[in-house]
Curated annotation (Swiss-Prot):
Entry's Gene Ontology cellular component terms: small ribosomal subunit
Cleaved signal peptide residues: none
Pfam family, one: Ribosomal_S4
GO biological process: ribosomal small subunit biogenesis; translation
Annotated protein name in UniProt: Small ribosomal subunit protein uS4
A GO term for molecular function: rRNA binding
Gene (UniProt): rpsD
Amino acid sequence: MTKRTSAKYKIDRRMGENIWGRPKSPVNRREYGPGQHGQRRKGKLSDFGIQLRAKQKLKGYYGDLTEKQFRRIYGEAERVKGDTGENLIGLLERRLDAVVYRAKFVPTVFAARQFVNHGHVLVNGKRVNIPSYRVKEGDVIEVREKSKQNVAVLEAVQLAERDVPDYIEVDHSKLTATFVRAPGLADVPYPVVMEPNLVVEFYAKN
């Protein structure tokens, strides 16, 4: 188990929100952050603090992306025509690990990253082991035949915690998914409020 995987609930506690909507999140039991000082009363956040929190929450949701990774994606969103915040969400949802998670092939986004890294996923019939690989409209993502009896996969397919969004068409009997289109913010089934507009404000000022 990687440090990032073992720390997934610390992200919830740091944000003070159950950002993946999981029943076992410690936030369901307590509302303070991690560490010995977590129970201290939090003061009112400044505009900077609110914007930073929005960025950290979005980074955390997609597997605790590094600042370098997230900043690179944001830079691409900024260069593409249209609303930068909406573009950012679309690019994040195009990540292969995000699609594997959305398709409910695995239970968590951290498991999705590991699953892709270990070569369990095919894109258009070819093995792809890069979690950040950008999926295109019409791409078919599937679990390799040898990996279809993976316990994590079997458990995830049975989960009722997450609905598959309509921008991905999934056949769980075959463990295949087709990426239909890049979504906007309103299309993505986040369990908590995500505010990419605040991320745009953060980078505009910093």
